[in-house]
């Protein structure tokens, strides 16, 4: 689904509370990067943050939806939509975004460790 330029600018402005955020258009959406880590995305003017088995519970408790690029159906997504009220509250947003960055950092570290073992 399309992502509006205005919405991307709004999200980037809100996320500036975390620090410099890079973004890149991809597959009709926008990828969000902090310190080179892919921690979130925007699709159809909805923000999704990276989750793991621990942080997913917080999103499920907030009744947010998993990112499902292929439509509805059973999915164990690594990305969940951000509650709208969190996007509007900079203190909460910084906490949720920082958590998503840490999830991305842990996943990147575990991938690097697996790659090193194979060599």
Feature-to-residue mapping (PLM):
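Charge-dense, helix-prone N-terminal extensions
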Residues: 1-119
